[in-house]
């Protein structure tokens, strides 16, 4: 199973969407500065994960979550879950 994940910067509240076999291990990599984009926005926390059966479906879901419609869906999902601390201002 592939995990699509969304992480939020605790520094500037920006979001990053990606996919990995192990989302927690990938989060550690983001927080250690191994990713050029996320390095300057550390530290990060996971705000959303979703399992996909394979890389192809994971990539489609990642692409959707990066779209305007996907971001709207994610904001609505977070609002409904009751954890609004991760919502953009």
Locations of regions flagged by a protein language model:
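Structure-specific nucleic-acid interaction/processing domains
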Residues: 1-89
């Amino acid at each position: 199973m592939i995990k699509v994940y969304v992480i939020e910067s605790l520094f500037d509240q920006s979001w990053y969407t990606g996919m990995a076999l192990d989302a927690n291990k990938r989060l550690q990599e983001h927080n250690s500065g191994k990713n050029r984009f996320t390095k300057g926005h550390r530290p990060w926390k996971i705000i959303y994960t979703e399992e996909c059966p394979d890389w192809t479906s994971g990539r489609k879901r990642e692409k959707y979550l990066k779209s305007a419609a996907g971001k709207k869906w994610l904001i609505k999902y977070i609002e409904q879950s009751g954890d609004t601390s991760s919502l953009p201002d």
